[in-house]
Amino acid sequence: MDLNHLNLRVRDAVACREFYERHFRFRLAFEAEGGFFVRNDAGFLLALVPAVRHQPLPTGFHIGFRLDRPDDVTALRSSLDRDGVGTGPLEDSRPHEDYVTFRCWDPDGTEIEVFWDGS
């Protein structure tokens, strides 16, 4: 069984679509419900649908992207910083020594963890 999709209700579907396409290699799959459905190379579908009334996500909710190498994590963080995207500090050795991570936020404020875990 595979996790297939995530539906995010967002304030600005266009800005979120551009963010995920530019920084996380998603591509438009189709448009519906006034929003965008974008897919990555692994086949995961992210639905970015306009919210009628915005409700903040629960504390601790985040999306995680695992990258292939620790250098990929630092390169993406640098790219996001250059583009003015807010990022948290680069951390390593948490929860074990084969772990490198940072946090950032999409245009709607959804927290994203980018990491490499040695697997």
PLM regions with names:
Residues 15, 70-75:
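Short, conserved charged micro-motifs
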Residues 12-27:
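Amphipathic alpha-helical segments
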Residues 5-7, 37, 62-64, 101-103:
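Short aromatic/hydrophobic contact patches that present stacked aromatics
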Residues 1-2, 56-60, 96:
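Short glycine-enriched loop/turn motifs at secondary-structure junctions
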Residues 27-59, 111-116:
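Conserved short beta-strand elements that form part of the metal-binding/catalytic scaffold
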Residues 1-15, 63, 118-119:
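N-terminal beta-strand motif that seeds the catalytic metal site of vicinal oxygen chelate
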